[in-house]
Regions:
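Intrinsically disordered, low-complexity regulatory segments
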Residues: 1-140, 149, 218, 423
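Basic, low-complexity terminal or inter-domain segments flanking catalytic cores
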Residues: 2-3, 15, 22-24, 97, ...
């Protein structure tokens, strides 16, 4: 019988299959095979603890059946998902769905997808690490609880569609704080005195009459001019010349955050784009040696390097650059993050033999750019440091001192690979105590500038330094903030939108820990402790949940609604309050602004256009048009005393045929149908054909799976969505 290996992605499965013989079958889970319910909290919370309600997504049901069938036939089923917490959890869920004891599923891990790495992993399996699984579950539960409970509260107090989250809100707070700094900034004009001596020496005033000048200290233009006038009369000598040798240390190899930062600043890639390309390079691409992974795992906060890779790099440096560029021993780096998962490796090429030039005919241009960046950085990390000579010259007179600085490259070291953008600034040959002639003295005005807005790269750097999130969350967090219309990224600068200020103001006042970077970092440490079996994940959840829910309940009562409603100028007939226009998922309506104390609702005039008013046959009241998820209907305006309702004749009829669109299953007609749960679109050949869609089908095919598309509103935007694979395409809004 064959052995079964389960990985996450089809690309990874395809690459691994190339390395193994016929005795192995490789299948991809396509990410998580089950998750918390999308339509509810998905977690049962009681005195016994937190129990998840995991649901297999309908897109995964057939795949799960296939995995179970293959596993039953296999002599051994290997779990080969990624070696981070997310990968460990995916493997755990797959094993649970197959059934049986977890110990019966060997867990294999590897940091690169090469034949040697896969074969070695098969020789050294371990068991599924439940500490890692529990850490992932704790993170998932925390994110769901915060997102579900807090987002609902925020949306009810500001406007629908807004959200808050454990990591996203802490990141958004950083952006808002920077915006506040920029708005509060007041420019300062200050002056420097810049001297030009012969021959070709530029220097700046650093002290006057025995007093050291601080940066930006000279702010009085008149005073600056007076000092200039005095110093122009002085005679000058070379007071001191100091020369020092200084090393520029090699940079460490990349981890996730630094790769995203460098790819942003050097290649112009967004973090999301960087990770997408890196994923392809890791999972397998065409090379002269066949399809294989050309970089190690790209979601890592470790700077460890395998011994074999270090030896390869050192051999390469010695061969191509000579012994002067090779340090006496391999360089070892450690992450500043004390909780870095050191079992992982830094991001490096899987084979130093695969130079970028050797792959230029195999990789796409953007793939080659990122691979080149990773390759050069890794090789440079094992070279000698660059060596500079720094020079400092002080020119003095009786009343002041001027200072000039210079730098000269003595040995290029790792610059041989990475290059050096800093040009040498050479000072003329001078001798101490020699006189020097002042050629010109200028008083120059400067204006301070506000703090720069974050770029995606600099925000990731701050998130990492503060311990907010993990390598796998940086790019998705920024993408989520953009998608929620909290931030926009233009010309590499992140700016906050108005809704972001409102959300953060509420969170700062009522949920300060959610936006507190220290709290977020401490929670990450708790998750790390769970992963290392130093903390119980149920207890960590309890410690967070109950105080948090107390604040949610308090927020419902105490947070003042910031929703803006258009005034009608009319008074409420029930309590005398003011009637305002409001919106719900069913349309616009008029209601009393004293809600919830007064629950009077009046339908808007627009909603009644074209609808004949009737008298209620039960109480004599007026029948007015209202809306529900099933469409428009007539209801008595004396509700709740009278609950009479009546369907509208001009409501779209059930079984109304959708013109120009045929059933993708049998070619029959598709019609609008109704049930007690609402309207839907189904095939007229039911029950012989079971095709149905919650959204209106259109005469268009999905580019991904070629199934029928539908039109819908997705995340507040018009979109076409595949009825089968759920691939969606946002539609461009008309400018007019």
């Amino acid at each position: 019988m064959k052995h079964l290996i389960i990985v996450e992605s089809p690309a990874k499965a395809k690459t691994i299959k190339n390395f193994l013989d016929k005795n192995y079958e490789v299948i991809a889970s396509k990410g998580h095979v089950r998750d918390l319910s999308k339509f509810a909290l998905g977690i049962k919370i009681d005195e016994t603890g937190f129990t998840p309600n995991y649901v297999v997504d309908k897109d995964h049901k057939e795949l799960v059946k296939q995995i179970i069938e293959l596993s039953k036939k296999a002599s051994t089923t290997y779990i080969a998902t990624d070696e981070d917490r997310e990968g460990e959890a995916i493997g755990y869920h797959v094993a649970c769905l197959i059934g049986g004891e977890l110990e019966s599923y060997p867990r294999i891990v590897f940091h690169e997808i090469t034949q040697n790495a896969i074969l070695n992993a098969l020789k050294t399996p371990r068991q599924i690490d439940m500490s890692k699984v529990n850490a992932q579950q704790a993170r998932r539960f925390l994110d769901r609880i915060v997102g579900f409970k807090l987002s609902s509260l925020i949306a009810s107090k500001i406007t629908k569609g807004l959200s808050a989250g454990r990591v996203q809100s802490a990141a958004l707070k950083l952006v808002i704080d920077r915006e506040r700094e920029i708005k509060a900034f007041k420019p300062l004009t200050y002056f420097t005195l810049d001297a030009y001596f012969e021959p070709h020496l530029e220097a700046q005033l650093i002290s006057y009459k025995g007093n050291k000048l601080k940066a930006q200290e000279l702010i009085d233009k008149k005073k600056a001019q007076e000092i200039k006038n005095e110093l122009e009369k002085e005679s000058y000598t070379i007071s001191s010349i100091i020369k020092k040798s200084k090393k520029s240390p090699t940079p460490p190899p990349f981890m996730t955050s630094t790769l995203q930062q460098s790819a942003s600043s050097l290649l112009g890639f967004s973090p999301t784009k960087t990770m997408s390309i890196a994923q392809k390079l890791y999972e397998g691409v065409a090379t002269p040696q066949g399809v294989m992974g050309v970089i190690t795992y790209m979601r890592t906060d470790s700077l460890n390097i395998a011994k074999e890779a270090l030896e390869e790099a050192r051999d390469k440096i010695l061969k191509d650059y000579g012994k002067d560029y090779l340090p006496p021993k391999a360089k070892v780096y450690s992450s500043k993050n004390k909780n870095a998962q050191e079992a992982h490796e830094a991001i490096r090429p899987t084979s130093i033999i695969l130079e970028p030039n050797a792959l230029k005919d195999y990789l796409k241009p953007e793939e080659l750019k990122l691979y080149t960046l990773i390759y050069k950085r890794f090789l440079a990390s094992q070279m000698q440091d660059a060596l500079f000579e720094s020079q400092s010259v002080v020119v003095a007179c009786e009343k002041g001192e001027f200072k000039a600085s210079g730098r000269k490259l003595l040995f290029d070291g790792y610059y041989k690979i990475l290059g050096n953008d800093d040009k040498d600034k050479l000072l003329p040959n001078l001798k101490e105590n020699d006189p020097i002639k002042l050629e010109k003295l200028e008083s120059n005005a400067h204006v301070t500038e506000p703090p720069a807005r974050y770029s995606e790269a600099s925000l990731i750097k701050v998130l990492e330094s503060l311990g907010i999130g993990r390598p796998s969350t940086y790019a998705p967090t920024i993408s989520l903030l953009q998608h929620r219309d909290y931030i926009k990224v233009e010309k590499k600068q992140i700016s906050a939108l108005e809704s972001a200020f409102k959300v953060i103001e509420i969170l700062e006042k009522h949920f300060e820990e959610i936006v507190d970077s220290k709290f977020s970092a401490s929670l990450e440490e708790e998750l790390d402790n769970i992963a290392q079996n130093k903390a119980d994940y149920q207890q960590v959840l309890k410690d967070f949940y109950y105080p948090f829910m107390d604040k949610i309940e308090a927020g419902k009562k105490n947070i003042i609604s910031q929703k803006v409603h258009e005034k009608t100028g009319q008074s409420c007939p029930k309590c005398g309050g003011e009637l305002v226009k409001k919106n719900s998922r069913y349309g616009e309506f008029i209601a009393c602004n004293n809600y919830p104390k007064c629950k009077y609702v009046k339908q808007t005039e627009n909603a009644n256009d074209g609808v004949k008013q009737e008298l209620c046959e039960k109480c004599g009241g007026e029948m007015v048009q209202k809306f529900s998820r099933n469409g428009a209907f007539l209801a008595c305006n004396n509700y709740p005393e009278c609950k009479n309702t009546k369907s509208l004749k001009n409501t779209p009829n059930a079984n109304e045929i959708i013109e120009g669109v045929k059933c993708p299953e049998c070619g029959g007609d598709i019609a609008l149908k109704r049930s007690r749960k609402g309207s839907f679109y189904g095939c007229n050949n039911y029950p012989k054909c079971n095709f149905l869609s919650n959204h209106k089908p259109i005469d268009k095919r999905c580019e991904k799976c070629h199934y029928l598309m539908s039109e819908r509103i997705y995340r507040k935007k018009k979109a076409h969505e595949c009825i089968q694979c759920k691939e969606h395409v946002f539609l461009e809004e008309d400018d007019g």
